[in-house]
Amino acid sequence: MLKRRRTARTVALLVVLASVVVLALPTVKRIVRDLTLPLAYTSLIRQQARIEHLDPALIAAVIFAETKFDARTSPTGALGLMQIEPATAEFLAHRSGGVAFEVSDLAEPGINIRYGAYYLRYLLDQYGGNETLALAAYNGGQTNVADWLAQAHAARVRFTIAAIRFPQTRAYVARVERAQHSYASEYPRLVSGFTTSSSG
């Protein structure tokens, strides 16, 4: 009799524990997702994606690769969520119709995301919509991409991630591409109403 009561209590306890796990699982998954794949400024990202005809998951992925949504200044002087260098930001400000530009503007998320999205669109346009080339230029610079393209052309091979000579830039492009897919699948409301291509 005592053994049956213990068994019944054990079964009841296991049922309660299983119920708690089942009920808590979505919350735990969401917490893990938010820690490993953070997302903030969704409305700003979506707004700039719409203006620049970009995949919002691409913008989020660049922010993730650059700062994981924790804006800071890099050792090279790049600033803000999308790590834009002041000289690049000044070029972008003038090109996009800005009249006054201050380096401190880059600390403001709305301005930083606007310039970063504008720069991504500019690079995509420069490289015929090729995201690999645009991301390589975003991280490694357009001069280096021109050199890598020339080397691939001289060798009569198609340009791929493997042709990127800087290991950091090669890893960056791969990280952004992975994160872009993750943002699209983990945050469906981020990309809702958008096509998945940023080619223009």
Predicted regions and their residues:
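Hydrophobic membrane-insertion alpha-helices, especially the h-region
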Residues: 9-26
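Catalytic glycan-binding domains that act on GlcNAc-containing polysaccharides
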Residues: 24-200
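N-terminal Lys/Arg-rich, disordered targeting/topogenic segments
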Residues: 1-6
